[in-house]
């Protein structure tokens, strides 16, 4: 299976983030996806099986996990990209850390696309606009490479208020205990 970089027409590079993730016991996309589910991406729990040892947020912060899932050097996986979008929207993420990682990892275009989708569905969430202010607009990701933006949200057809589409960004649930 080709990598996301290959689908984007980019060359792969030696990734410091990928090396850090591998050193933390996360050698591939599947292990990153398992960790995302363990860290609260329960919406995707049927996507992966098994568990992985969580190296801890001090060693692998949620920002690293998000950018890792959206990183272009791994095997291409729409499910990993959807989980990466969810982890990117984690409530306590620092946009400055995400921006630094995006630059360092050549993930700016992908993260910009996700942030644009986030702003479309959550126009008052400051995190998305902070990302967009800090990311260069160097062209679009080709259509069909990333999941459709509606795959990053949960949509309802009928609510207590009646019929109508209500969208909510899928993000990790707060874990207690």
Question: What label would you give each PLM region?
Answer:
Residues 124-177:
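Charge-dense, extended regions
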Residues 26-60:
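Short gly/ser-rich loop at a beta-strand->alpha-helix junction or flexible surface loop bordering the NTP-binding
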Residues 2-3, 14-16, 30, 35-38, ...:
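General helical secondary-structure elements
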Residues 9, 13, 24-29, 76, ...:
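Non-membrane alpha-helical secondary structure
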Residues 1-23:
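Basic, Lys/Arg-rich alpha-helical nucleic-acid-recognition elements, primarily the DNA-binding modules
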Residues 33-34, 118, 158-159:
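Alpha-helical interaction segments
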Residues 46-141:
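Mid-protein regulatory/catalytic core that forms ligand/cofactor-binding pockets
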Residues 10, 14, 36-37, 121, ...:
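Short linear sequence motifs
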